[in-house]
Each structure stands twice: as C-alpha cells, then as structure tokens.
Amino acid sequence: MEAVSLITILLVVTASNADKICIGYQSTNSTETVDTLTENNVPVTHAKELLHTEHNGMLCATNLGHPLILDTCTIEGLIYGNPSCDLLLGGGEWSYIVERPSAVNGMCYPGNVENLEELRSLFSSASSYQRIQILPDTIWNVSYSGTSKACSDSFYRSMRWLTQKNNAYPIQDAQYTNNRGKSILFMWGINHPPTDTVQTNLYTRTDTTTSVTTEDINRTFKPVIGPRPLVNGQQGRIDYYWSVLKPGQTLRVRSNGNLIAPWYGHILSGESHGRILKTDLNSGNCVVQCQTERGGLNTTLPFHNVSKYAFGNCPKYVGVKSLKLAVGLRNVPARSSRGLFGAIAGFIEGGWSGLVAGWYGFQHSNDQGVGMAADKGSTQKAIDKITSKVNNIIDKMNKQYEVIDHEFNELEARLNMINNKIDDQIQDIWAYNAELLVLLENQKTLDEHDANVNNLYNKVKRALGSNAVEDGNGCFELYHKCDDQCMETIRNGTYDRQKYQEESRLERQKIEGVKLESEGTYKILTIYSTVASSLVLAMGFAAFLFWAMSNGSCRCNICI
C-alpha cells in the first residue's frame, strides 16, 4: 500500500509541476443581468443601460432659448390683451410657453373664441411676438372707449369696443394694408347684448350688420340678442374671432353696431418648439437638451421614460422601466451549456482579476512564475462591435415621432379620445420595437462572445497539438518546458510545435510509463491480496474443524 500511495503522490506532483496555459475572460464582481430572446436575467460581466429615467424637476432653457411663463394669464388672455396681463404686452421671445393650471386671466368678458386651439397652436409655434397698431382710434367717429366690470372696469388691449356717440352710430368703414413684410395676427369680436334695451342703448338700433374682409376671408355677422346665464356678472356675450393678414393684403371692416374692432395686432416671428406646458414647475437656472412637463433632462442615451410629451433634442420615449444592453461576456464561472455554441471552453472559475486590457485573454504558469495577457485581436474586434451596437440601435430607432398634447374643444372630445388612443398605440409599438431590438442584440452579443472564447480555445488547441493535454477546465498542461517567450508564441499564433515535439514525446512517454508501472503494481498487489486472503480463510476453516472434532462437537464418518 505504501508503494501505491507513493505512485499517486508522484502523479499529482508531476501534473502540478507541468507548465500550463489557460484561456479565460475578464473577471468582474458584476451583478448585472440582461434579457435575451431565450433567457431572462442572464448574468453578464458588463451591461449598459440604454434608458434614461431621471429629470431635474424644473423648467429650463433649451437650445432655442428660455420659456415664456404666463403665470396668471392664459395664451388667449395674452393675445387679446386681458388688462390683467399688461406685463406681457411688451412682446417677448420663447422656446416654449408655460401656462399655469391655475391661470384665471383669459377672456375676461364671457364668450367663445372661434378656433381657439388653432390660435394657441399658431401663437406658440412662433418664437417671438411684437404688438403693432393696425386701426388707430382716430379712424372711428363713434365712441371707442367701451369698458366692462368683467374686465376690471377696463377692456382688452388689442381691441376697441365701439358704441354710439351722441345717440348716433353711423356706418364705420376702416381699412388697413399690411406693408410690414410679415404676417399680422389680428382679432375682433361681436357683442351680443342680453336685451333689446341694452342693444339700443349701445348701438341705437337692433338690426345691425358687421363685415370683416381680406383677400382670404369674407365674414358677415349679426347680433343674437337675448339673456344668457350670468358669468362674471354679465348676461351678454362676445364672440371672439381672429385671422392672419398676409403681407400686401388689406383688411376692411364695415359695421353699424355690435363691433369689437381690431386695434393692435401681433407680428409673429421665428420658430419655437411649439409646445405649451401646463405645469406648476418652478423655473430653474438651467439649460437642457430635452424638456418635459415633469422636468428637464440631459442624456446621451437613446431612450428615456420620463414623459411621452418630451420635446427638444430628446431620445426616443419608451414606456418601460429598463433597457439593458449586454456589452460583455456571460458572467458564468463554471462551464455549462450556453447559447448556440454549447459548452464554452475557457471559462475559469471566478475569472481573473487584472485582465484589464480586454475581455478575452490568457493566464500561464511556468518556472518564471504566473503571467496574464489579453488577446488584443479578438478583444478589439469585440470592442468595435460593441461600440457600433448602440449606434445601430439609435439608427434603427431614429424615425422621428413626437407625441404632442393636442388641444381639442369640448365638441371634439371624441376626436381627442381617438387621438390619445392612437398616440398610446404608437408609443406601445415603439416600446415593443425597442425591447425586441435590445433582446436581439443581447442574444447576438452573448452568442458572439461564446463563439469568440471557443474560437480562441480551439486556436490554442490546434497550435499545441500533441504537445499538451486538456485538463477539462479551459487549460492546457504542456508536455515541455515553456518560458515566457514560449508562452507569448502560443498567444500570438507563432508557436513552433515541431521545436518542442521531441521533448513533449519523451515527457508524454515518461508519464505514460509511470501510469503503466502503476497499473502493473496494482495488478500484482491485487493478485497477492486475493491469494493471501484465500489462504487465511482456508487455514481458519481447518483450525475450526480440528477444534470441533477434538472436543466431540463435530464427527466425521467415512462410508465405503
């Protein structure tokens, strides 16, 4: 038995003293996981989150400038000149407009604005406005200073309320030609008194007609006299209208009563984001590339999930919580069946720390110590592919589609519902496309890495040939001595197998001879043990018979 133990120890020592080279991957303590088409929560050495999820919670400037914050006013209150919005009359510039949900200063005198949503969209799409006078007071030969308690005993800054003067209201006929070289937004209104008495007190007659014409429009209006529900202390109403006077066009207004006449107009210039945010967010001293009603964000990632109403230089919105792209290897310490390529050779338990130059590499041990090096060729190819993957995803998702918070009036509620459903469906499709694209890329990445490690392992295996033996753990035990220079030739593909073939053959025969001697010794010991055991049993049985016969416990009869 002592001989057997000695041989076993010799074999272990022989194996442990062999020079060795292993193929492995960069070691990490990563807890990152990604999803693929076939697996969820696959551990990986490195992953990149493609989804931006944070915002600063503030209203910020964008590349187009600062926002116009209306505070207590609405956009229509600004356009028509609500007297409570006087601070905004000096003109302004904006990249987007902020309207507070609690804004109360809109149309102070009750009534409806025709095509209000289109007007708000037109105004907000510009980046600046300038107020200009189009019909001066001196053009009227009636009173032009009508006011209302509903408007703080004042009236709109962009229109004049024309009423009778000295119990007379002759036909008013005014013209304005746009020589400004830019389009002018102008507004007017028609008053609908609650009673005939109020009508005649204001305009001396009940049957009046107003016409407003340009090269593009030809509108005629008559008042609808009658009481309405009390709003802002008024039973009367004003219907509000607007139009755009293009350069060179002429506006003509004719009326013998009930006219709220144009006074000032707006020259709209430039182009903004065209967005109206209804939010109570505070304005911050910040500049962002992308703004939402929840806050601003800056990111280089291709996707975000902050708000579908984002605008600016924004990544694509997808309504998911995470989109992780695998940019490294499977972080699996033990060999197992993975991916499309089966068992992956070269995955060393725990990986190697220090292989910082890349994913794939070699570790060796010889008389000079232990060394480690990355395989720069395969690593660089992998890095190049990873670098291009994010760009490919961005390119594949670069079709521009912005969800705009469309405004519809109450009569268009059904249209609004349909629009929202369409927007939601499109967003769901984008999210599905993004997730599917990332799943496909992750599957491809991990399978490519599996193949790369396998190829590197097989490359070394082919180079070494019979000069080494696989240990089953991603390593090769060499039958010859291999210094650091020799190890480098294995790594860079210049290994000369014939140079070490004779030394390897002798070492292999030596090891195989030890194995044969060991096997012969085992056979001899086995035979000896069997014979000895049989003799001991036979002698024991004979002694038992002798003892039994001597004391009469056993008798032997021989019959002939």
Predicted regions and their residues:
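Extracellular/luminal domains of secretory-pathway glycoproteins
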Residues: 2-560
